[in-house]
Amino acid sequence: SRGLGDVYKRQVSMVQGVFAQKIEIKGTIRNATDNEATEFVNVVLQTTDSVFVNGVSTNNNGSFIFNKVEAGNYRLVLSCVGYNTQYITLNGVKRNTDLGDIFLEDASVALEGVIINGSNQINRPDRKLVFPSERQMKVSTNGVNLLQELMLPRIQVNPMNNEIGISGGGELQIRINGVKADINEIKALRPADIIRIEYHDNPGLRYGNAEIVLDYIVRRPDTGGSFGTDLSQGINAMWGSYNVFGKVNHKKTEFGLSYHMGPRDFYGMYRDNEETFRLADGNTTQRVEKGEPSHAMLFMQNLNVSYSLQASKNSLFSATFRLRGNNQPNWDYQGVLYNVNDETDMVNMIDRTKNSWTRPSLDLYYQQNLKKKQTLVFNLVGTYNREKSHRIYQESLHNEMLTDINNNVLGDKYSLIGEAIYEKQFSKGNALSFGLKHTQSYSNNEYRNGHNYDTRMNQGNSYIFSEYRGKINKLDYRLGISLTRFYYNQSGNDDSSKKYNVNPKATLHYTFSENSYLRWKAEVFNATPSLSNLSAIEQTIDSFQIRRGNPNLKSYMCYRTELTYEWKKGIFYSNLWGAYDYRPNAIMDEKLQEDNKIVQTWDNQKDWQKLSGRLMLRVGPLWDMLQLSFTGGVNHYMSHGNNYSHTYTNWYYDCLLYTSPSPRDRQK
């Protein structure tokens, strides 16, 4: 038997033709185990010195074809999830060439990769396969920096803080070889180890509520190791980002370690604020806060310790211990608070917050590839979260204390998440998957603010789903349905809340050509109230306001539909997107007047709606070092409360000019 990193090479010699012409190269990819045609295989045509020429994916019959190829010497690179990568050398191609059946051998979960000199991207109905070029890997220092080079749609990268986000908001899920990861594990990746990034902008039900999924497919060497650091330090302020990481491989096992430390210490932070209260009796109060320089200080640290075992080519087990911590001894504001209608009515204000949290977790993941293209995945995550918060708010005049608020909150939360997924792939790209996920959490909170309050919350969320993926000619479709059960109970409340929901989801993806497609998606899902909103404890904000939770909040349904059109040609790329959200009985805040106080609370309101549109244009890379992108859009919000109605329109745009040094400059 061959090992994990085996690469199969095949030499094909061509008979020289007598006519110089544009030729075609074609073939059919089959599974070496069962002789079935294999679709969605990435077929990349390169010159013999690894310069990218063209790239396609195999169709339902496992076939591929390259048209209008110049005569010459080439190399084919065949890669697909679950198979060993195969290289085929084509010498002296001068006539139409049919390679016939090409057989791919099954591989382990983490595959060996493809080295491509020209940037390449292959579209699939549910994701994009993005292959970094050799230049992009050479000018990047880690997995986050490489993402900046790729400039994927909607992905926002902050190179200063090594942070990744989504334009327009939403949950971003990061994975490495299919296993959930976090930003610090991506920072620890060496660009040379990254084969490709799978960009899911239409994730299936197995990914939960994720808006976008980024899956880094990386190499797994048989033996050896690596160690590195990534250090950044501000010059004029105490701002630092210090990263240390290492990895050791020995046969079937891999050990990894990464540590991040981020101190912040700023002087001169201030806050300007303006509030207007229109009271039920017809009076209006308008207050303005004029901030003065103050102090902010925090200390972040993250630790990852991982172990993985690939006992066979079809199985993968990984265990990751994560420790997250944030200590914020100072987050202080101070200034003058005055009445707009009478500026002589003013007080001195101090608002100081000290908090910290520690969050250890253990993540266990197991994947087993079975015969006949079947996959089983099990994931278990246990987390403990401990938080402390101390807030002091004071208003004074001429050294006389008018308002003195001292809030202390101590919280403990225990959670356990279990997940099981089964997937069966059929011919012609069809696939069926089932999944079960349950989240159980227990929280205890202690409130000390002149009174002592203790709350206990028990919350559970169960999720069962089934999804089918199919294809009819150029139309790909995905149909899914899930059943959710939400339960919670708060101490002191004899009644518990329990609700069941059925949530359908449908996606239609029509491919016009290799360069453009149109996709429509519609889904129904449920949203649950947060633990903080459910707590009936009152917390005083200032001399005028009180915050109070609502234990009677109910979960609610969310309806969403969106339409996407994408076109790309060479260095030009465009993406046009529109969406509509409708959420009846949405949880939104409301304000009540009780005596001379304003109470901020939450309730299930009439509905919340949102209309969105976005256009993205991108050009690059130019001269192998310059990329330009423009993103512009609009969000129109409509909030219909039980006693109010609000509308708001937000226009936005984002222009980015990104340059990177050439590999030669980087090496110098």
Task: Describe the role of every protein-language-model region.
Residues 21, 44, 63, 77, ...:
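Membrane-proximal, glycine/serine-rich, low-complexity loop/turn segments characteristic
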Residues 48-63:
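Short, acidic Ser/Thr/Gly-rich low-complexity loop/linker segments typical of extracellular
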Residues 268-284, 330-346, 389-397, 444-452, ...:
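Outer-membrane beta-barrel translocator domains and adjoining extracellular loop/strand segments
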Residues 211-212, 216-231, 331-335, 433-441, ...:
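Surface-exposed extracellular loop regions of Gram-negative outer-membrane beta-barrel proteins
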